[in-house]
Regions:
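N-terminal catalytic cores of NTP/NDP-binding nucleotidyl/phosphoryl-transfer enzymes
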Residues: 10-73
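Short acidic-hydrophobic, aromatic-tinged amphipathic segments that line or gate anion-handling sites
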Residues: 2-9, 90
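Residue-level signal for inorganic ion chemistry
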Residues: 28, 81, 118, 178, ...
Length: 307
């Protein structure tokens, strides 16, 4: 997959293509529908599949105090798009240059790509202050001679799938429901840091990921059944998100994961924690023995949820 990181580089990709356009800030099922539609069209036209998106959330520039937590990292996005068979990813920073483009100027820049068709979602906007809509885009398609495919929004039950809805589910601990909208389990990746090793003393050693500086959506505090990816291999496990109320000495929330049937040193290594189901909320226990008993029950509950 070729990756283009600025508008000035667009001309470097000269092959005929079909372009999926969108912010794609979560790569949820609605986004995937747009991309899969573009993929089918590209195959039909014997063209390359291009995805045009932004490497940062537009709010970082236009509403810096209201940037929503990320549902996916840049590396995860690139990996998923490569798995989908994308030929070229246009992943440019949303900055003042982009924010100031009028809808027509945006399309003129996009014409550096040799596209025959654009595919967007029904709520797609573009250009300065989102002045461009699917209706102005349809008029431009007619005038400029390209095909436009507008995909209807995708729903899960009675709810339209959106990144906002998914963030709300994650914040409420409803990770199974979030997974239904994402089309995959929500995950957090990070580098394993040293902790206080209380888990090891309790018989449940944990791999700890600090969440303080990670601008990602963090599930509601509690215990979760998880799958953990270590060196490309998947393990079952249980994770706790929170402040360790029994000990009361944690100032920032932590993600602590006990990986079942795993031995080895993980300090300094990357791992990915995929949230499958919330088991319970955070509890302050009267003592260590009560905590141990609960951890044993938690492990049983997690193993059951992961079957």
């Amino acid at each position: 997959m070729e990756i283009i990181t600025s508008l000035e580089q667009l001309h470097k990709f000269s092959a005929p293509c079909v372009v999926a356009l969108g912010t794609f800030d979560g790569l949820h099922r609605g986004h995937l529908d747009v991309i899969e539609t573009a993929k089918a069209k590209a195959h039909e036209c014997n063209s390359q599949l291009a995805v045009f998106t932004f490497s940062n959330h537009p709010f970082e520039w236009i509403r810096p105090g209201m940037v929503p937590p990320a549902l996916i990292t840049g590396a995860q996005k690139q990996e998923l798009l490569q798995q989908l068979g994308v030929d070229v990813l246009v992943d440019i920073p949303f900055n003042q240059q982009v924010a100031d483009l009028s809808p027509q100027e945006f399309l003129q820049r996009l014409q550096q790509l040799d596209y025959s068709c654009l595919v967007v979602g029904a709520n797609f906007t573009y250009g300065c202050r989102g002045q461009g809509t699917v209706y102005t885009l349809a008029a431009s398609a007619k005038a400029m001679g390209f095909e436009l495919i507008v995909r209807e929004l995708v729903s899960e039950g009675a709810t339209v799938i959106s990144s906002t809805a998914i963030r709300q589910l994650i914040a409420a601990g409803e990770v199974a429901e979030a997974a239904a909208m994402l089309g995959r389990s929500y995950s957090i990746s990070g580098t394993v840091a040293h902790g206080n090793e209380r888990g090891r003393l309790l018989g449940y050693p944990t791999a700890n990921i600090e969440l303080e500086d990670a601008h990602v959506a963090v599930p509601l505090g509690g215990v979760y059944a998880v799958r953990v990816i270590v060196n490309g291999k998947s393990y079952h496990g249980m994770a706790n998100i929170g402040y360790n109320p029994t000990f009361g000495d944690v100032a920032q929330p932590r993600l602590e994961t006990n990986i079942f049937d795993f031995t080895g040193d993980l300090y300094g290594k990357q791992l990915t924690v995929q949230f499958v189901q919330r088991i319970r909320g955070e509890v302050k226990f009267a003592g260590i023995e009560q905590l141990k008993q609960q951890l044993a029950q938690d492990k049983n509950d997690c193993e059951e949820a992961l079957r």
